[in-house]
Amino acid sequence: MNYHTPSSFSDASTIAAKSTGQIRFLAGGTDVLVQMRSDILTPDDLIDVKQIQGVKDITQNNNGSWTLGIAVTGAEMSEHFEFKKAWPGLVEAADLIGSTQIQGRATIAGNLCNGSPAADSVPAQIAAGATVSITGPTGERIEAVENIPIGPGKTSLKKGELISAIHIPAREKHSGDAYLRFIPRTEMDIAVVGCAVNLRLENDSIVEARVALGAVAPKVLLVEQCSQAILGTKLDEEALSNLSAAAENACNPISDKRGTKDFRTNVAGVLAARAAKIAYNRAQGKSDE
């Protein structure tokens, strides 16, 4: 195995593009190192990106948007007061990834690149309207987060490409987000269903909404029908019922030891309504209490 410590994303991309074997990028390492120690994975080229400038930075830009380095951990997001205030749902999602120790190492960039349909932070990123910078052999491009996962363990990243930054929009006035999941245990488990909602209000009516569902399909879903179900409403009971129905209709889950298809589908409808209520209250400036 060759171990690389590039000083730039361009160098990292070049190494990956030239590799003739299996490659892995290393930031938090909470998955790749476990796989290596368990002899599940032995990459030919392990590319450690932690020496690249800016990978640990959380930066608020002049327009209020945010840029997250790809080695920023969930714990670091949670400890950043202004970011947590702006995007509590996204931070809550990151806070659910593993144990306290894992949260001190795991990154939401890695959570995205794993391609897991049950990844906690990915629905929240999608609901937020996050995009990523991707560096590759032909330069840099911007892509919406919802276009990165394409199936279990698979992403749309091409050979030699890696995510070089995550971009989160500015928090608009009278808007809020939330993330909820269902798990069999009280903590440290994989989501049976996850749901993130981000919405904006004008005169208490919803004028913008994004709803994302996790663990109910081969990849995390951005569900336009859920958004349409609540647009123009003040999230009354009829709107919540329509939202739940739209969430259920979007589901195409598997049955496994953690939940049947029917159970996951039902829970998706319940979580969508609950997450929407929390996001709506936050958009109104109300406390979560």
Question: What are the residue ranges of the model-derived segments?
Answer:
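C-terminal structural segment of proteins
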Residues: 1-289
